[in-house]
Design a protein with these regions (language model features):
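Rhodanese-like catalytic fold shared by cysteine-dependent sulfurtransferases
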Residues: 1-34, 39-78, 87-137
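Short, surface-exposed ligand- or partner-binding patches at beta-edge/loop junctions that are enriched
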Residues: 81-83
């Protein structure tokens, strides 16, 4: 039996019911040392680049490059996988889990969930929180 078989066997009703496979965008952006893994295509990325400089680190690795570049994805941090529709993020989630990544989650796959957190009031709060964390270190 291979690792993908093992992964699928663990995807029971309880697993999906608990929501262990996903993470809300607000939670992801507030998670210290988390990674926002953007798996969208080059044309999508060239149209809308997601930086999140005041929140968390962003890695842009198109889905087709994930196998060759998987060592760039930290294993010791929460990884929130993002795409614009949900299909690619789900595939990358399953792939990373099947090769031993433990703390991988599927982020909401739409721009509205992301941009609603970047309005001035919420962005100001994120900047203040990040500054306080840095001063406390």
């Amino acid at each position: 039996m291979n690792s993908l078989d093992n992964l699928l066997e663990g995807m029971t009703f309880d697993f999906f019911g608990s929501g262990k496979h996903k993470i809300e965008m607000e939670t992801l952006l507030a998670t210290k040392d988390a990674i926002f893994l953007d798996v969208r295509s080059r044309p999508e990325w060239e149209s809308i680049q997601i930086k999140l400089e005041h929140h968390i680190k962003v890695l842009w690795i198109p889905i087709e490059e994930i196998p060759a570049r998987r060592d760039e994805i930290p294993r010791d941090q929460t990884v929130g996988v993002f795409c614009s529709a949900g299909t690619r993020s789900t595939i990358v989630y399953a792939y990373l889990r099947s090769i031993g990544y433990e703390d991988v989650r599927i982020a909401p796959s739409n721009y509205d969930a992301l941009t609603s957190l970047l309005l001035p009031g919420k962005l100001h709060k994120a900047i203040a929180t990040r500054k306080a964390q840095q001063e406390g270190e």
